[in-house]
Amino acid sequence: RRSELAVTMWIAYHRLFDRAGEQSLVDHYRAVYAPNAPGFARMQVQLKALADYAKAHQIRLYLAMTPDVHNLVDYKFGFVHDTMRQIAQGDGYTYVDLLPAMQGRPPEELFAMPGDPHPNALGHQLMADAIFPVIK
């Protein structure tokens, strides 16, 4: 209950004081996944290190790409999926894109609670249904 209040307050604050709209979220993701972004470069190094370890120890790796569920009808973040697919394939991961399992659904169907885009039980079930055939 306390975490729901914190999330609700965080959402209310950001809706009032941040740049509004989907475009600000797209801009944020473009900045995060820019080739020269320090966090992006660190992520690539860590994914490669994990891949090298897995290869040395004969471990299969999977990268499941979870979509941003704010707008699954007119999805604006395909560039993130493309980037992560390229990295995964280059490093030897099996890539599983979860967007097709969720695309076209209204976000409210998948939100853990109003305004919180973390997946609810249905979202988790859709992801599991998409991942299971790949890993079995």
PLM region spans:
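Serine-dependent acyl-ester chemistry module
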Residues: 1-86, 90-93, 98-104, 108-109
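Histidine-centered active-site loop/cap adjacent to the catalytic His
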Residues: 114-136
